[in-house]
């Protein structure tokens, strides 16, 4: 009886060790997703890169970044007829807010906040988990 119990206990330990090894050695798979709003479209590509398209259909808006956090940055922007595109990359994990300024043709200035939540996986990979883009209260 003791021999059977010992064998079952050893088998259970082996199964637990194998299951833990499989869970801990899973390869990192970045998540891509799209977040759309009334005047923006944000595409997270390969986990740590964000393409932010800001609407300019009426051609009366000029977008610029006025404040950037330490956990992400914009490395380039492109302005076309219908939108302004910002390429944003994650630099570190955490939550950060980037402030965009929109200047309308009539001189009116509106501020918008891009808020990102970034997590770290397997100590080296960054993943953008959530995106929000909202107009700030004046």
Predicted segments, located by residue:
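Core hydrophobic alpha-helical transmembrane segments of single-pass membrane proteins
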Residues: 11-19
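Extracytoplasmic soluble-region selector
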Residues: 2-7, 19-138
């Amino acid at each position: 009886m003791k021999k059977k119990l010992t064998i079952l206990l050893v088998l259970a330990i082996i199964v637990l060790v194998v299951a833990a090894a499989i869970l801990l050695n899973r390869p990192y798979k970045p998540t891509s997703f799209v977040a759309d709003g009334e005047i923006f479209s944000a595409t997270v590509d390969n986990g740590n890169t964000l393409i932010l398209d800001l609407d300019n259909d009426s051609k009366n808006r000029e977008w610029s970044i006025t404040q950037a956090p330490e956990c992400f940055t914009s490395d380039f922007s492109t302005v076309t007829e219908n939108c302004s595109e910002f390429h944003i990359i994650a630099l570190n994990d955490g939550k950060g807010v980037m402030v965009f300024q929109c200047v309308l043709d009539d001189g009116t200035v509106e501020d918008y906040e891009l808020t990102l939540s970034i997590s770290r996986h397997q100590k080296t990979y960054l993943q953008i988990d959530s995106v929000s883009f909202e107009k700030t209260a004046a």
